[in-house]
Amino acid sequence: MTLERGQPWGSTAPLPDDGIIVASDTEAASAVATARAAGRAVPVLGLVGGDLCRTLGGTGDAARLRTSDAVTLPVDIAEVDVDGDVHVFLAHVIARRSWWRGQVWAAMNAEWLGRWDIAPRAHPGDGLLDTFDASLGLRDRARARRRLETGTHLPHPAIEQRRVPAARVALDEPLDIWVDG
């Protein structure tokens, strides 16, 4: 279910008895991947940590998840194929060699990556990924990095930003890949 302008998104309800409490984006993606691999429905997840939790305004209070104040929201589930290995992700995929040189590519479903507001317009229920492709010089990279905490690194002429339902990218050189971690 994709978010639509002017329509309610989510509802208040306690985490179901079979819901799974997860403390990180890695745990959340693993729970989804495990259910899919077993042919089961994706479980309702109670987020108490991670970038997706922060994006959704989560407080990290596990006890609150079992109360009627808990909010249940549908979020997009994405996949990335890395050299033939398919991985589920809920928050982000980052491809880079170094933060200080070379290409950096990101697909963001969550707004945050740690303390950085990388994708200020990202919404985990809109059916879109916010992708970023950057190869900045050292001076511009340092300036952009200082502005990441507030999300004011954008717009930037050397950072290509797109909002897309799917992305296919061929990287310029071999890069390390981080999936929800």
Residues covered by each model-derived region:
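Catalytic core of DAGKc-family lipid kinases
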Residues: 1-112, 118
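A short, compositionally biased
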Residues: 69-77, 126, 163-164, 169-174
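Short secondary-structure boundary/capping segments within folded domains
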Residues: 12-13, 120-122, 158-159
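Short low-complexity stretches enriched in small and charged residues
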Residues: 84-94, 121-126, 150-155
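Internal helical hairpin/lid segments
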Residues: 100-144, 149
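ATP/nucleoside-binding phosphotransfer catalytic cores, i.e., glycine-rich phosphate-binding loops
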Residues: 133-181
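Generic structural hydrophobic/aromatic packing signal, biased to beta-strands
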Residues: 78-80, 105-107, 131, 167-169, ...
